A protein has these predicted regions:
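Structural helix-adjacent loops and short alpha-helical linkers that scaffold large soluble proteins
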Residues: 1-10, 46-60, 93-108, 141-149, ...
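Long, well-ordered core segments of solenoidal/helical folds
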Residues: 5-24, 57-74, 102-123, 149-168, ...
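Solvent-exposed loop and edge beta-strand segments that line ligand/cofactor-binding
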Residues: 18-36, 67-83, 119-131, 172-188, ...
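Non-membrane alpha-helical segments in proteins
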Residues: 33-49, 81-93
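Solenoidal tandem-repeat scaffolds enriched in leucines and small polar residues
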Residues: 134, 146-193
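Acidic, glycine-rich loop-and-beta core segments that form the ion-binding/anion-interacting portion
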Residues: 198, 206-243
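Single conserved hydrophobic/aromatic residue that forms the stacking wall/gate
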Residues: 257-268
Length: 268
């Protein structure tokens, strides 16, 4: 007997394979979280569990279109919807033996462009993990020379206080710039990505200093959970000091305000 989750998975797969067959996904970007690479990963896992020759044939046709786009078009370069995410996805597909593809030439051709984009993004205040420089730093985490340049750019652009580093960045459409401690687009992603950087040749003292001082700022934003329903604001207390209610979606950018959920015993 199928579970509700299994029914939902089949429903998602049916829509994706139908749209692939009809060419409706051909114009999507190549990204991992918002693009064709994420779709391919889902479909590869789906066919592992639920083999279907017709769907496998549809996916093969889609892969041809995907690789043509990957090798012939320069679109977004970012982790979420662009080329860096596609490379991360291909690395995963190869590692999990879901796909065997040599993309080293493509990666080599884009390396300088991606790394230059990452450094310039950080220097211009766009360190954003999903849509800026940090996603590229994560992908090239073993390239010590590049990582050290990224660390230098981060420290150079930080606003420095008493054992505190903080950065201003875009807060979204019509919201200007401000401080953001969240994971997807904010300073928590700086801590997360830099914590992965352990390869030989990386300036560990600088890395640790940035992590420590960024954590100090994040922790300085803690609020009373009894009053607000959560421990931290969604972005920063500094952006709107007059705001009384700090409902939070700290963990991810796309969730609704879900802070009451952990206290709902019916969800246990």
């Amino acid at each position: 007997m199928k579970t509700r989750i299994e029914h939902k998975i089949h429903a998602i797969a049916d829509v994706l394979f139908r749209d692939m067959k009809d060419g409706k996904l051909d114009n999507e970007g190549v990204g991992l979280l918002a693009g064709q690479t994420g779709i391919i990963i889902f479909c590869k896992h789906y066919l592992q569990v639920f083999p279907n020759s017709e769907k496998e044939e549809i996916l093969e046709g889609f892969l041809e279109t995907y690789f043509d786009k990957l090798t012939s078009e320069i679109g977004l370069l970012t982790y979420c919807g662009g080329f860096t995410g596609a490379l991360e996805g291909l690395k995963y597909l190869n590692r999990e033996r879901l796909l065997e593809i040599d993309y080293s030439d493509v990666e080599k051709n884009y390396r300088e462009l991606l790394q230059t984009f990452a450094i310039n993004s950080i220097l211009n205040g766009n360190y954003d993990y999903l849509h800026g420089g940090l996603g590229i730093v994560k992908y090239y985490c073993d390239d010590a020379e590049f990582v050290n340049r990224a660390l230098e750019a981060l420290e150079q652009t930080a606003e420095k206080g008493d054992r505190i580093y903080k950065w201003k960045s875009s807060l979204g459409l019509d919201r200007g710039v401000g401080y953001n401690i969240c994971l997807s687009h904010g300073m928590s992603s700086i801590v997360s990505v830099l914590s992965l950087l352990g390869s030989e040749g990386i300036d560990q003292k600088k890395r640790d200093r940035i992590i420590r001082n960024t954590c100090n700022y994040i922790l300085s934003q803690e609020i009373d959970p009894q009053q607000h329903g959560n421990y931290f604001p969604s972005q920063s207390l500094e952006n709107d000091p007059e705001q009384i209610n700090h409902q939070s979606r700290l963990g991810w950018c796309c969730l609704l305000y879900t802070s009451p959920s952990p206290r709902d015993r019916s969800l246990s």
